[in-house]
Amino acid sequence: MIRRPPRSTPKPSSAASDVYKRQVAMTAKAHDLKNQGVDVITLSAGEPDFDIPDYIKEAAVNAINENYHKYSPVDGYLDLKKAICKKFKRDNNLDYNTDQIVVSTGAKQSIANVCMSLINKGDEVVIPTPYWVSYSAMVSLADGIPVFVHPDENANYKVTAAQLESAITDKTKMVMLNSPNNPSGSVFTKEEYLEFSKVLMKYPKIIVVSDEIYEHINYGVESVSFASLPGMYERTVTVNGISKAFAMTGWRIGYLGAPKTLAKACNKMQGQITSGANCIAQRAAITALEESPDRIKYMVEEFKIRRDLIIDLVNQINGFNVKEPPSGAFYIFPEVSQLFGKTFDGHLVSNANDLSMLILEKAHVATVPGDAFGYPHCIRISYSASREQIKEAISRIKELLT
């Protein structure tokens, strides 16, 4: 199933604006409850709850003591870009030179740089659903048209190559991919991505943006870099960062590897908006990326325990359906449409937004309604919380909906 907004869609679209307004209202409600002293359990967070590893903290302290406090190069310190190149080779079998790397203020800015550098008015960008909330807004802000492709109901939130191809037209400029996926946690296999690449070989002018920010948070399904597939390196922008894997969301370091001409364009764009990323965070990022990924496996191991725990508990709630255990990230994305049209504690639930607001107001648990991700029949629940918090939160929800 493919959904295109009308040609006259404003920037950003009114639908996206409505979703954003509801998110803002829900966030404000959660803060209001907390300010009143209410014990709100936050299962809406898109960030790890772990502390930053000590060896990375030490690198930041050393950078301060070594007086790294001036503007950095727009595209990042050279030694950080070298560390990123080594990381791409070690983890992803990708060979980039430093002039193909741009360090940004978070992976979100990396993607925005690509959109603003590449998309012209009326260009279409194919976005499989569910998708991270900012993708469509970034496309719209660049005067592009987001084209949403929906997977089949029992496909574990993954579109097929045939569905992807059905969305491509002569106006398609870009395809956005995200694996492991936020919000579903689904991971595309190498075989699935190879089928995508066969389709895209027919359309050599299309650029692929591969958002791999959750790369290291996976539970057995190998995470594949799209650029590593035959014929895809020259037309893929690989986006990553330190936020999720190293629990460094507030440090705001993302980066991309891209064809040289596109990296140069992104560098120019960034130079007129933010310039270089935070200098201390960049120095810490060097240490984070140079160390073995094995040093952060303890986080992934704990996330897997929490994933199994929350699925077991949520599946005991009538009306919640987790189709398959997510293979990556730290979210579950249960289908909840069986609850629509029902009344709980005197409140009618007509949609996922109603359900999330009800759960927040009555059970004091924060979640995110699925319409933010292009899936209005689901809600996103993060298991980036302690096991005790997860048990208490799901117990509250179950009691409310029973």
What are these regions (language model features)?
Residues 286, 302-314, 322-342, 377:
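Conserved glycine-rich beta-strand-loop-beta hairpin in the small C-terminal domain of fold type I
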Residues 151-221:
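Active-site phosphate-binding strand-loop segment of PLP-dependent enzymes
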Residues 231-304, 308-317, 401:
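Conserved core segment of the aminotransferase class I/II
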Residues 1-16, 20:
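Single conserved hydrophobic/aromatic residue that forms the stacking wall/gate
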Residues 90, 165-166, 342-350, 354-402:
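PLP-dependent enzyme catalytic core of the Aspartate aminotransferase-like
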Residues 21-106, 113, 288-291, 401-402:
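N-terminal small-domain helix-loop-helix segment of the aminotransferase-like
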Residues 117-139:
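Conserved PLP-anchoring active-site segment centered on the Schiff-base-forming lysine
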Residues 140-147:
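A short helix-loop-beta submotif of the ANL/AMP-binding
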